[in-house]
Curated annotation (Swiss-Prot):
Biased composition regions of type Acidic residues, renumbered to the chain: 231-242
Alphabetized InterPro entries for the sequence: Asp-B-hydro/Triadin_dom, Asp/Arg/Pro-Hydrxlase, ASPH, IPNS-like_sf, TPR-like_helical_dom_sf, TPR_rpt
SMART domains, per the entry: TPR
Organism (species): Mus musculus
Segments on the Lumenal face: 84-741
Protein keywords: Calcium, Dioxygenase, Disulfide bond, Endoplasmic reticulum, Glycoprotein, Iron, Membrane, Metal-binding, Oxidoreductase, Phosphoprotein, Repeat, Sarcoplasmic reticulum, Signal-anchor, TPR repeat, Transmembrane, Transmembrane helix
Gene field: Asph
Binding site for Fe cation: H662, H708
TPR repeat positions: 324-357, 365-398, 437-470, 472-504, 508-540
Residue intervals passing through the bilayer: 63-83
Cytoplasmic side: 1-62
Biased composition (Low complexity): 26-40
Cofactor list: Fe cation
Protein name as catalogued: Aspartyl/asparaginyl beta-hydroxylase
Stretches of the chain forming a coiled coil according to its record: none
Amino acid sequence: MAPRKNAKGGGGNSSSSGSGSGSGSGSPSTGSSGSSSSPGARREAKHGGHKNGRRGGISGGSFFTWFMVIALLGVWTSVAVVWFDLVDYEEVLGKLGVYDADGDGDFDVDDAKVLLGLKERSPSERTFPPEEEAETHAELEEQAPEGADIQNVEDEVKEQIQSLLQESVHTDHDLEADGLAGEPQPEVEDFLTVTDSDDRFEDLEPGTVHEEIEDTYHVEDTASQNHPNDMEEMTNEQENSDPSEAVTDAGVLLPHAEEVRHQDYDEPVYEPSEHEGVAISDNTIDDSSIISEEINVASVEEQQDTPPVKKKKPKLLNKFDKTIKAELDAAEKLRKRGKIEEAVNAFEELVRKYPQSPRARYGKAQCEDDLAEKQRSNEVLRRAIETYQEAADLPDAPTDLVKLSLKRRSERQQFLGHMRGSLLTLQRLVQLFPSDTTLKNDLGVGYLLLGDNDSAKKVYEEVLNVTPNDGFAKVHYGFILKAQNKISESIPYLKEGIESGDPGTDDGRFYFHLGDAMQRVGNKEAYKWYELGHKRGHFASVWQRSLYNVNGLKAQPWWTPRETGYTELVKSLERNWKLIRDEGLMVMDKAKGLFLPEDENLREKGDWSQFTLWQQGRKNENACKGAPKTCALLEKFSETTGCRRGQIKYSIMHPGTHVWPHTGPTNCRLRMHLGLVIPKEGCKIRCANETRTWEEGKVLIFDDSFEHEVWQDASSFRLIFIVDVWHPELTPQQRRSLPAI
């Protein structure tokens, strides 16, 4: 029976039996010839199973001929593929690494066998534990096709390789195409928007420089502010302010711990950017005279490493709200996912259904708050402010919800510049939660923002009576004392407040005020605090302590006209110095009070007054009537008349005057002094560690963001003309966009 089957089947059974009797991994030659039981079977197998031999296949010569044809065809096909660049080998190479199953670094037949279960992984590729090895090996053997023709398996392997190759190449091309299509392309708008974490304000022009404008505490008793002769910023009560009016109140800049910004959405607000911050000087200045003893203040890192006090999760649900918790959670989930419009609708529906639900009302306020930021809408923000009030006024509102609602209401009122409204909200908070010192500290800030130092002082005294170690209260109380010119009394409060490391105390202005107070009482420890402020990143250097800066500007105390690039302005001033002098003397002779006393408490003693022609880039028309030729002379020099961070003014100083060491507010300007009436001896100015004197008809140029000090020990008055100019490295765009100081 077997020979007949061989004759009909062409030797297929012989091959199968041979494979079955031998090992599963026999060679292809063995598998193809098989082990026949009779010579007849071998002969029939040789002739393809047909008795006359004509249809049993090809002869040996024919087989060789066809083999050569196929081989040559393969060679020429390969040449064609390479020559015509049909396959991008750069794209194929390395793409099959993921299929390297045997660990030999490439993908080949052995890898395919492993993937198909015909071969074990190399030891380096085994990922299963030893105890599972035997079981896994057995499974692989079971999966192997028993009795299968090995030649057929090899063909299948080759087919698998080709399919995997095609799949890999096409997949990679698809992925690249998808990546290019799906990758967000940079848009022009990306360069026009403010990259603020809150994303609250209007888009700015390309290249706009953002400024760190921090809270301004306006005080009645002005302190040395490191802003020599500068008029300070306008009051934050924006509802009553007139942008066209010149600033008339001298304020003292001081930070709020929360860094609340007082600004309507409609107005562009300048935030700190990577281009602005503390200016870093590349120039080495001799600090050898500065004391560098250690100060026992916890570093910022140490403060951050201190484990925070675990806060209790606020309880925002009353008994009724707990019954609708699922609906509240669903609406809140929309808000947290950024689906603001949907969340607003959801909470509005909840408020409609459950008008007495404090949590629903509070959620509505939060959504309106978020929507105001998204749309940059003052109107929506005002709605949010009212809704926060409504949530706090509902009966049976949880105390935590009342506190959070009113606190946020106060913050958003401050944001809009509604300082009085914010103060009323803070007063109510303190009445409801009299033991919460944090709220009292915020109330003190509210009074300072309105310029009510006396009320703020009382608040901080109350806080310190209850919690004597409250660092936030100490630095603010010390600041108020210094503003009242109680220099010695302010020092321990400022010092201990900074040393506490409490939130809101690590601010450059507190370091400055402490150092300034120490300098005034002759305490050389002042420079230790300046050094620490520099190390903390608040000051560019021990000498350069301005707070409103643009990073990367050249920093050096003294400049030459050539270095500034404003040689024409300098030449014009020096050519016309007598004209400028004569008009200044005429204004003095009129004795109409046009020269105003310096009112920033920068003098230790003496008499120092100024007559201002330009301030913050705005011309004083009335003042220029007293010096018309001088004003006409300056009109063509926009680097000074357009300098919104400086002034143009006459400065007269009488004998016996000493101006404390102080620092200007910004590194964005340079200051020119033109000598008009200079006594032969006794007048000098120090900037950083170099002291110079004035000459009549000559211009001195220095960077007043560096510490400087003035002495007038002559026997007659000294008159100079002060001209501020933009720092020469500021771009035109920066000069347009930087806010005025």
